[in-house]
Structure formats: C-alpha cells, structure tokens
C-alpha cells in the first residue's frame, strides 16, 4: 500500500506528498498533469520502479489538485511552481534529483528548476 503524507506549505495550507526515501544519492521527482493527482498509474508505477531499483522518489499534488489545499479554479501556474520549489527545497535540499513531468508537470519542471537557484 502506498503511504501519502502531508507537508505544510504555509501555516494552514497542506500539500500532499509521496516520499519514498531509500538513502540513494538521486531522487526522482514526478510532477503530474493538470487536474491530476498522485493516485494515477504514472506516479504509482514510478514509485514502485524506484523502490525496486533503490532510488528515492518524490511526488506532490499542487494546490487545488488531489487532496492538497485549495480549489483548482483558484490555482495559478506561479502558485504551482512555488509548490514544486518549496517541496524540492524542503525534502531534497542539495541532493541530486531528476524531474519527470507529465503534461503540465513537464512544463512546471524546468520552470521550477530555473527558479530554484
């Protein structure tokens, strides 16, 4: 069974995450698509694949998606980018990571990365 957790983005705003920490030197970060969540085939497959190959895995649901805070219609690209940056900084810190994105996530990945530095 997959265990999802929450991380506080702000005082009362929780983001749902899936973080499989296996003490690897690399973390695969999966960013889902628009109006999607982490319970689909792609994130669950990647999580299983990473566990099997002893690689850390991280995914999150942006604001207004899945069980994270907020309503979808109030979300913005900037807000979702900030969600991604926050989770990467908080969980991965300075470790190496590889971003894999689907649909919107494929766009948020590079946009978030350029704002991490």
Predicted segments — roles?
Residues 25-33:
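Short beta-strand element of the alpha/beta-hydrolase
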Residues 66-91:
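Catalytic nucleophile-loop/oxyanion-hole region of alpha/beta-hydrolase
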Residues 101, 105, 109:
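Gly/Ala-rich beta-loop-alpha elbow adjacent to hydrolase catalytic centers
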